[in-house]
Curated annotation (Swiss-Prot):
GO biological process, one term: thymidine metabolic process
Lineage top rank: taxon: Eukaryota
Family: Belongs to the thymidine kinase family.
Name of the protein this chain belongs to: Thymidine kinase
Pfam families on file: TK
Positions with a binding annotation for Zn(2+): 209, 212, 241
Binding site for ATP: 74-81, 152-155
Gene: TK
GO molecular function: ATP binding; metal ion binding; thymidine kinase activity
Active site: 153 (proton acceptor)
Species in which this protein is naturally found: Oryza sativa subsp. japonica
Amino acid sequence: MRSLLAASTFLRSGASPLLRPLSRPLPSRLNLSRFGPVRPVSAAAAAADKSRGGGGSAMEAQPSYPGEIHVIVGPMFAGKTTALLRRVQVEAGTGSRNVALIKSDKDNRYGLDSVVTHDGTKMPCWALPELSSFQDKLGTEAYDKVDVIGIDEAQFFDDLHDFCCKAADRDGKIVVVAGLDGDYKRNKFGSVLDIIPLADSVTKLTARCELCGRRAFFTLRKTRETKTELIGGADVYMPVCRQHYLDGQIVIEATRIVLDLEKSKVIHAFK
């Protein structure tokens, strides 16, 4: 039975933390809260790690086999994070591969030290502002030993395309990416769609419409905030079907007009 590589441990050098194999299988309901946090290495430790063998030509760094890229997309509450953890288990195989998880440090809903599903299950991760800093944070020696990289909330990483190309094509990593393909306006969100041409597989998940129970492909924002990046959960967003997405836009626009009129009346009353 396949096992999940999830626990944090230090390499023998003591320089860098790395997620190592576990012997227990992933249950049907994920329960990963027992794992301790992954702690980032210091800049000094990373520099020392580089000096031990981080250099080398591009030819020397070329892996003996190419990597892979697997993409998981869908609206909010579609189970993308759960699918990410399950896919990581599959790619981990029988326990012979090392895995590291990354998420954007913009996603602070459940803390920055774990990837957390909406039902509260978690797994330790690296929270980073950009993916390009991952190798430096982990250390070259530890990075070379990572076989599988999972990326959650991938829409927040501007350098997603470049990182995936480098990790899979040059470094031979298996990269599993989970993120929103569209924003609350149904427009492209971040660079997730840009890596689909690079992908070995693409999985489109759906949620259940919160209003009728039908399949939900879209995310409806319930507030008046208009900026694209607005971190939130069920208090801000809900998954909806096509009909209720369209109905919701009408309601939101009507509400905006009414509120603007009321605001205008209040302003004029004080003049």
